[in-house]
């Protein structure tokens, strides 16, 4: 079983540039002795709202009025977690009216309630795409691991399902993956060759691209998983409201926003 840490926009892959054509030379040299001036409290506050741009500011300020201890370690260490199964969530909302379940400022993650007719789930938004990676179970090829254990073993903050796994007659062990995955540069399994299967890959520049599952893996891909279907590519909806066997069931999907944020959606 492969697992990934962390209305999406996933870009189709452009042509791969020559690694030797680096743009680093265009950057101005940095003086290692130059110190960075600490942000004032007001600047820290504005930086927080800029990072978590989706927050409804008035609802967050009302939450702080009720819970002033939230700021005891500063704006960049705000930690709110009411995302547990038995929790009701916070009284914080996004500008679109969605309930906020958790905010982890240090790790730049926000959890948002997603719900509709007959379903609900959680959307995790990771602001720093460089934190995302794919990991394998300790018993890859033989047995899988509970997600919680896999995340803890690899120093992660949160995780979700990646590839599917071989499960003949419901008796699989979770250790043999279906399709192909790449985890931190190492490939596992074999590509799906059936039509409709896609591969989503993360490249060295922390961009996600969706391509056909049987296409060649580019040299700059660091992590990848394969499954079906692709829901959104370049802002275009690729499937209808009911896709073959999917319907309303527990599902997981991953994508990337126009701001390069990692979107990890789990429907319960």
Segments the model singles out, each with a brief description of its role:
Residues 118-123, 197, 248-253:
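Short glycine-rich loop/turn motifs
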Residues 115-118, 191-194, 244-248:
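A short catalytic or substrate-binding loop motif that flags glycine-/basic-rich loops and adjacent residues
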Residues 157-161, 201, 209, 253-255, ...:
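Structural recognition of the beta-strand scaffold that forms the well-ordered cores
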Residues 130-131, 164-168, 216-217, 250, ...:
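Solvent-exposed loop/turn segments at secondary-structure junctions
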Residues 166-243:
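Active-site-adjacent helix-turn-beta-strand microarchitecture at beta-sheet edges
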Residues 1-190:
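Zymogen propeptides
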Residues 126-130, 201-207, 234, 256-260:
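Short acidic-glycine loop/turn motifs at beta-strand connectors
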Residues 233-268:
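Domain-core and long-helix interface of multi-subunit machines
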């Amino acid at each position: 079983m492969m697992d990934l840490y962390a209305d999406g926009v996933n870009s189709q892959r452009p042509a791969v540039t020559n690694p030797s054509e680096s743009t680093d030379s265009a950057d101005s040299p940095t003086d290692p002795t130059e110190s960075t001036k600490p942000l004032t409290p007001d600047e820290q506050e504005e930086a927080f709202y800029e990072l978590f741009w989706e927050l409804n500011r008035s609802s967050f300020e009302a939450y702080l009025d009720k819970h002033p201890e939230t700021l005891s370690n500063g704006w960049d260490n705000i930690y709110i977690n009411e995302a547990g199964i038995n929790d009701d969530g916070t009284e914080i909302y996004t500008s679109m009216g969605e309930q906020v379940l958790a905010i982890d400022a240090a790790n730049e993650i926000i959890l948002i309630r997603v719900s509709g007719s007959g379903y609900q789930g959680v959307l995790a938004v990771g602001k720093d795409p460089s934190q995302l990676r794919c990991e394998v179970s300790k018993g890859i090829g033989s047995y899988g691991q509970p997600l919680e254990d896999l995340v803890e073993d690899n120093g992660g903050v949160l995780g979700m399902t990646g590839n599917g796994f071989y499960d003949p007659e419901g008796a699989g062990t979770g250790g043999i993956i279906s399709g192909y995955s790449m985890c931190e540069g190492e490939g596992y399994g074999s590509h799906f060759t059936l039509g409709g299967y896609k591969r989503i890959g993360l490249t060295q520049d922390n961009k996600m691209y969706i391509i056909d599952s049987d296409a060649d893996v580019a040299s700059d891909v660091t992590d990848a998983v394969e499954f079906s279907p692709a829901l959104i590519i370049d802002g275009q909806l690729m499937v209808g409201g009911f896709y073959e066997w999917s319907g309303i069931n527990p599902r997981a999907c991953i994508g990337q926003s126009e701001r390069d944020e990692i979107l990890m959606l789990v429907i319960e």
